Swiss-Prot record:
Function: Sterol glycosyltransferase responsible for the glycosylation of ergosterol to form ergosterol-glucoside. Mediates autophagic degradation of peroxisomes (pexophagy).
InterPro entries: ATG26_PH_GRAM1 (IPR048066), ATG26_PH_GRAM2 (IPR048065), EryCIII-like_C (IPR010610), Glycosyltransferase_28 (IPR050426), GlycoTrans_28_N (IPR004276), GRAM (IPR004182), PH-like_dom_sf (IPR011993), PH_domain (IPR001849)
Catalytic function, reaction form: a sterol + UDP-alpha-D-glucose = a sterol 3-beta-D-glucoside + UDP + H(+); ergosterol + UDP-alpha-D-glucose = ergosteryl 3-beta-D-glucoside + UDP + H(+)
Protein name stated in the entry: Sterol 3-beta-glucosyltransferase
Residue ranges, compositional bias (Basic and acidic residues): 25-34, 540-549
Record field: compositional bias (Polar residues): 723-741
Transmembrane domains' residue ranges: none
Cellular localization per UniProt: Cytoplasm; Preautophagosomal structure membrane
Any one GO BP annotation for this protein: carbohydrate metabolic process
GRAM domain ranges (all copies): 220-267, 609-675
Species assigned in the record: Pichia angusta
Residue sites binding UDP-alpha-D-glucose per the record: 797-798, 800, 1071, 1098, 1100, 1113, 1116-1118, 1137-1138
Top-level taxonomic group: Eukaryota
Domain notes per entry: The GRAM and PH domains are required for the localization of ATG26 to the preautophagosomal structure (PAS) and are involved in autophagy.
Length: 1241
């Protein structure tokens, strides 16, 4: 079946069939001669058929055996990973699609499954067979009590279910409904026969106005979507799933003349579905390069880093993609951290990317498959229309329980006579659906063949006779199957599946001629377009890659492309019209004839199509104007500026260059005219939010001025449209966070679904992405069914504990059990939030005092730490092991030392989470080894390696002794721990800490985990009056507090603060925190003036929105809180990560870093941050970005996505217990050799 490419499978006796005409009558096309069609379209069809899925499994599980031409059935692969009882027919050694679906559905419906959709199997009990809904049901808001109910008999491995809201529902009175089409004014139009049949079927009571209104809305929707005749009759509808490369939730509608399938696809306009680092190889050097990949609606873009997202190195239009797939060797599963190649095959070429591991590769490919599928269907919906007279065979097979698999074999059209297969999965009432279809076929006087699992020669003859009769019928009354697919795929009949990649790729390369408008690839771009693994691919693949690379190389550097580039330059220099207008409304605004307006409608249409093609834009994007100019970014790049309805784009036209810019209007702040860098040129500066300005040079003032006018006019229209569509009374902060919270909830649901897909893949070896229908009136909610027991382990200060409380509360909302393990003094605070608590050894104030005394890691620090904290480390290891019992998932701050060993013993998923740079990277130095000036990537990477070795050597003796005596594990080493392979969560904003391209896929910068406590906080009346009086006096209000820092002379620090506040003429809210914690004084030793109010501890989310600046020590949590609310920040770092964040605040331009703290430096900094408008505006911009992030939801999403990978790491480690009780084995003076590590002295 070719109508929806990713949900089709060819018939048994015939091969690939033609894609069906779209539903719009004007777009219908009849293909008379299938043999003359393009082979690239053939491959596009094959790329999305379930037959390719089956044959690909066959290639990986058993040797390929050609099928004899006389055999009528498609060869079905043997799934060695499935137990015999999971197959549809145990006696057959080749499972059919039913066998695969049986294994798949077992995870959805059985009581002893890993995961499933709980409500689906129970639909028969909730809805009678005669009760038929139209698929447009109420928006379910499940009762909280029902969310907490679980089946006591269910196996504890079950961890997924949808909310208990069946697919077949009724609409309540509050549910919005599409309005029916209004009647004609001239004559009251009676209901058509089709409308009457829908109303009669769906409303038992004639007086039920709501049901009738719903029925009319459904009939109008079906008529508009499927072009249903008024004389047709509605029979019934059923919820079902369409099977193919994806499993799509939707509805089956049966009428007197047609079988209809319809589903709403998820809508994510402009949002990023997935992003991360991937490795590419350049040609011909085969050097590896790390790039940043971003997956959006219809595009897969590659950038040089995660911050410069306006200049893609490569943009793949997924509307031209055939498929995405993984290439893995037999050793991949044995080593979960081994890199794996993936490839995206398009109509013109193949793109190779190296993922960090198999889990990452599967995540990328699954997301790509969903996007490719969605991009090939019109209007965010999937629609299939099958005339009943085209149906040849119905085959219903049982899967598990009431779950049925329906195979519909149809003749595509009277022109091609190709046979397509549609596979539908019913979780209830599958027999009733088949009965309805058979009844309407029988009533129409037609006949079909009832397929079985095996066929004899006589039965095959009957099928042939039936096929001939069907063809004769179609010749007399032509009809064709129609789908919402954007492309028409020809029918090519083959005896063997077209799965030879070499033949496919050669055809793809030769099928598309070089276009005059094709973007010429730069060196960096070219290296991305053809990737070839060296070790794990077959020789045939390598040879094919060489052919493709040579073909692309010839294309890129051909004489034709060179001449085209030179011609473009010459025309740009010499053309009397260096600009062109394409929108009629601007010509009217000028009040006179626009000499630059392109009057030919066909030329305007062709230019718009080229514009969309160049930048892979949506079909709704309009071209407004174009200009020839230079982009001055390093070396000036000559090219063309395109102004669209939503973006400003640039494309270089020089031969050998491939600079592309896609800049949304929403990110442009202003446009200014300037003088050009070169004599005779005019400049235009585009000011971008949070990004360096872009400078363009034009050959004339006229072109520059026209570009400025058009750009400002289009920006005003864009912003006006955005303002009109936004809520009128929403505050800036609340609207930012609420909108992004809704988006994060969608991402979280996708992560739950991905976690479900991972468990299915690990059990049955299939990787079929699942798409949940985004119905406008009802929503299928995927929620965790199993309650996992999370343990969050950390040591340190209040700032180290607070993020875990925020994460713990969110995990509890997901239905999990959470326990925080940390120092005893935080127990009341943690329990106040309803989180379980367990204590470990250690006094955090002593740790703070040691760190303040030794701001950097040096010999004296190691010596003092070893003498003071040796016994504490022993106690920490023992108490942590006891506290982490009965744990399913462990999340630990890596400074706690012991978590990775506990996870190895318990064989559970293990994650690390921290607030400062801790993983190896060239982008940032280690937080404890930050230099006074930037020393480059080599130094940064060295600091991480040196710290890892030093930190391990300082604790290795005690850790290994504890492993052997307490855990029963053998000794380990830095290399054997493989801590750089552990999934890592940075609870820091990507705005403050942009993820580096050399971060592994399992290293995620999630965003801050904020704990909002302002709702329960009652501020003292004195504090509120202090703030009000400062506002009346026209004075700036600043916050000064140093949190958990312990200082030896607190009175001197207080006096410096007092003098600085008076000097700067501001009002101060003071919070000394732990600054005098180790002292004996209980009251402030310095008398505070009226300009300073000693507030003590105040929730940041209550205080910071009301102040003008903040002064603090630069801890991650406090820095995030001040930046979150757009407050200019002054940081005086004392130790550790504080120096790192002080530098980041200065780099962002939203604050000041103090090297020395005295009243003069502090006063000067206070004046700077309260009066410098640049710092104030920059802080507001950074705050808006941080408020748009949802760190906690992103963290949970990452946990779900990486859970199976984290589990595989723990399981893959050594399990053999080596018990050594002799104390001689642990000699303190013995220098232990650590394999694979080194220490820089």
């Amino acid at each position: 079946m070719s109508g929806i490419e990713s949900t089709e499978e060819p018939c048994d006796s015939m091969t690939e069939s033609q894609s069906l005409s779209p539903l719009e009558p004007e777009e219908r096309q009849t293909r008379k001669d299938s043999g003359l069609q393009s082979q690239s379209l053939t491959k596009r069809h094959f790329a999305f058929s379930p037959h390719r899925l089956i044959t690909s499994i066959s290639r990986h599980t058993s040797p390929h055996k050609p099928r004899p031409k006389s055999e009528s059935r498609v060869p079905v692969p043997k799934l060695h990973s499935l137990p015999p009882q999971r197959l549809a027919s145990p006696e057959r050694d080749k499972p059919s699609i039913e066998g695969i679906s049986k294994s798949f559905v077992s995870f959805l419906t059985a009581a002893s499954v890993y995961a499933g959709f709980q409500d689906l199997e129970g639909e028969d009990q909730q809805v009678s067979p005669d009760d038929v809904s139209a698929g447009e049901s109420e928006d379910q808001q499940a009762d909280e009590s029902s969310d907490e109910q679980e089946d006591d008999d269910q196996d504890d491995r079950t961890f997924y279910a949808t909310d208990p809201s069946p697919t077949e529902l009724t609409i309540n009175e509050n549910t919005p409904l599409p309005e029916p089409e209004p009647p004609r004014r001239t004559l009251r139009k009676a209901r058509s026969r089709f409308e009457f049949s829908v109303v009669k079927r769906l409303s038992e009571n004639e007086n039920d106005q709501l049901a009738q209104k719903r029925a009319i809305a459904l009939s109008n929707k079906l008529k508009r979507t499927f072009d249903i005749s008024d004389t047709d009759v509605f029979i019934s509808d059923y919820p079902c799933w369409l099977m193919g490369d994806v499993l799509l939730q939707g509805h089956l509608y049966i009428t007197k003349h047609h079988i209809l399938f319809f589903a709403f696809l998820p809508k994510k306009q402009g949002s990023i579905s997935k992003s991360g680092a991937l490795t590419t190889k350049s040609y011909p050097s085969l050097r590896e390069h790390r790039k940043w990949a971003v997956l959006r609606n219809n595009t897969f873009s590659v950038y040089s880093n995660s911050t410069d997202l306006y200049f893609p190195l490569l943009v793949i239009d997924l509307r031209t993609a055939l498929r995405a797939e993984i290439l893995q060797s037999s050793s991949t599963k044995q080593n979960p951290s081994k890199p794996v190649w993936i490839r995206i095959i398009t109509e013109s070429r193949t793109h190779w990317f190296l993922a960090d591991n198999l889990a990452s590769a599967r995540s990328w490919v699954s997301s790509l498959k969903k996007h490719i599928f969605a991009s090939r269907n019109k209007g965010d919906q999937v629609a299939i229309k099958i005339p009943l007279q085209n149906v040849v065979d119905l085959e219903l097979t049982s899967v598990i329980g009431v779950t049925k698999n329906l195979r519909i074999k149809v003749i595509e059209s009277a022109d091609t006579f190709a046979i397509d297969d549609y596979f539908l999965m019913f979780f209830s009432r599958g027999e009733k659906a088949v009965e309805d279809i058979k009844k309407v076929i029988h009533d129409a006087g037609m006949e079909i063949s009832e397929g079985t699992s095996t066929e004899s020669e006589d039965e095959q003859g009957v099928d042939n006779n039936l096929l001939k009769s069907k063809i004769e019928l179609l010749k007399k009354s032509p009809s064709m199957v129609q789908t919402s697919s954007k492309s028409n795929v020809p029918v090519i009949r083959m005896d063997e599946p077209a799965d030879d990649f070499s033949q496919e790729q050669e055809s793809a390369e030769s099928s598309k001629p070089v276009s005059d408008d094709e973007i010429v690839s730069a060196d960096d771009n070219q290296e991305l377009e053809e990737k070839q693994p060296q070790d794990n691919l077959a020789n045939a693949e390598k040879e094919n890659h060489d052919k493709v690379s040579r073909a692309n190389s010839r294309r890129t550097w051909s004489t034709r492309s060179l001449v085209q580039g030179l011609t473009a330059i010459t025309q740009g220099w010499m053309s009397p019209s260096p600009m062109a207008h394409f929108d009629e409304k601007y010509a009217v605004l000028r009040g006179e004839e626009d000499s630059y307006f392109v009057k030919d409608a066909e030329q305007r249409k062709a230019a718009t199509e080229r514009f969309r093609k160049h930048f892979s834009l949506t079909d709704g994007e309009k071209l407004i104007a174009t200009y020839h100019a230079y982009l001055v970014k390093g070396i000036p790049a000559y090219g063309k500026i395109y102004l669209g309805s939503n973006e400003m784009c640039f494309r270089s036209t020089l031969p050998g260059t491939g600079t592309i810019m896609i800049l949304p209007f929403s990110d442009i702040e202003n446009v200014n005219k300037e003088k050009g860098f070169r004599f005779g040129y005019s400049g235009l500066v585009v000011v971008i939010h949070g990004h360096e300005e872009l400078f363009f040079e034009f050959a004339s003032d006229q072109a520059r001025d026209d570009c400025e006018f058009m750009l400002l006019k289009q920006m005003d229209m864009f912003k006006k449209g955005s303002t009109d569509s936004s809520p009128p009374n929403a505050s800036e902060g609340s609207s930012d966070e609420s909108c992004n919270l809704a988006e994060s909830n969608t991402s979280l649901a996708s992560a739950r679904l991905r976690m479900f897909e991972n468990r299915i893949h690990d059990a049955i070896g299939l990787d079929v992405p699942i798409i949940i229908e985004e119905h406008p009136l009802t929503k299928t909610k995927v929620r965790p069914l199993k309650s996992y027991r999370f343990t969050l382990l950390t040591i340190g200060s209040r700032g180290d504990v607070q993020p875990y409380i925020a994460l713990g509360k969110a995990l509890m909302k997901e239905g999990h059990q959470v326990r925080i393990v940390t120092h005893a003094e935080f127990e009341p605070w943690i329990k106040k939030h309803g989180i379980r608590f367990a204590s470990i050894a250690g006094d955090p104030s002593e740790l703070m005092a040691l760190m303040v005394t030794h701001p950097t890691i040096n010999y004296n620090f190691i010596k003092e730490a070893k003498s003071k904290f040796r016994s504490w480390i022993d106690d920490l290891l023992v108490t942590s092991w006891k506290a982490c019992q009965d744990t399913d998932i462990l999340i630990e701050s890596p400074s706690s030392i012991c978590g990775i060993h506990i996870a190895e013993k318990l064989q559970i998923p293990y994650f690390r989470a921290f607030t400062m740079p801790w993983t190896r990277t060239r982008a940032y130095p280690h937080a404890f080894m930050v230099p006074d000036q930037k020393l480059g990537g080599a130094y940064n990477y060295m600091t991480h390696v040196a710290f890892e070795n030093g930190y391990w050597r300082g604790t290795a003796h005690q850790v290994n002794k504890w492993r052997v005596e307490t855990l029963g594990l053998p000794k380990t080493s830095l290399a054997e721990m493989k801590q750089n392979n552990v999934p890592f969560l940075y609870n820091v904003s990507p705005t403050v800490f942009p993820p580096s391209v050399d971060f592994a896929e399992w290293v995620k910068v999630t965003g801050y985990w904020f704990l909002d406590e302002s709702e329960t906080y009652q501020p003292p009346e004195v504090l509120t009056k202090f703030i009000e009086q400062a506002r009346k006096d026209g004075k700036k209000v600043v916050y000064i507090g140093f949190g958990s820092i312990v200082v030896s002379k607190p009175s001197e620090l207080t006096q410096a603060v007092v003098d600085a506040v008076l000097e700067a003429d501001v009002r101060c809210i003071l919070n000394k925190g732990w600054s005098d914690r180790l002292g004996t004084k209980t009251e402030i030793e310095v008398v505070l003036p009226p300009e300073i109010y000693n507030a003590g501890s105040v929730p940041h989310d209550w205080l910071f929105p009301q102040i003008d600046a903040a002064v603090h020590h630069g801890g991650s949590g406090t820095t995030g809180a001040s930046l979150r609310f757009g407050v200019p920040t002054i940081i005086k770092p004392f130790f550790g990560d504080q120096k790192f964040y002080a530098g980041r605040v200065e780099d962002l331009g939203c604050g000041v870093s103090l090297k020395d703290l005295n009243y003069k430096s502090l006063a000067r900094a206070l004046k700077e941050v309260t009066t410098n408008t640049r710092i104030i505006e920059k802080a507001k911009l950074v705050g808006a970005r941080i408020r748009s992030e949802t760190g906690v939801q992103t963290a949970i999403e990452t946990i779900y996505n990486e859970m199976e990978y984290a589990r595989s790491l723990s399981i893959s480690k050594v399990k053999q217990v080596s018990v050594v009780k002799s104390d001689e084995e642990f000699d303190d003076d013995k220098d232990e050799e650590v394999e694979g590590s080194w220490l820089l002295v």
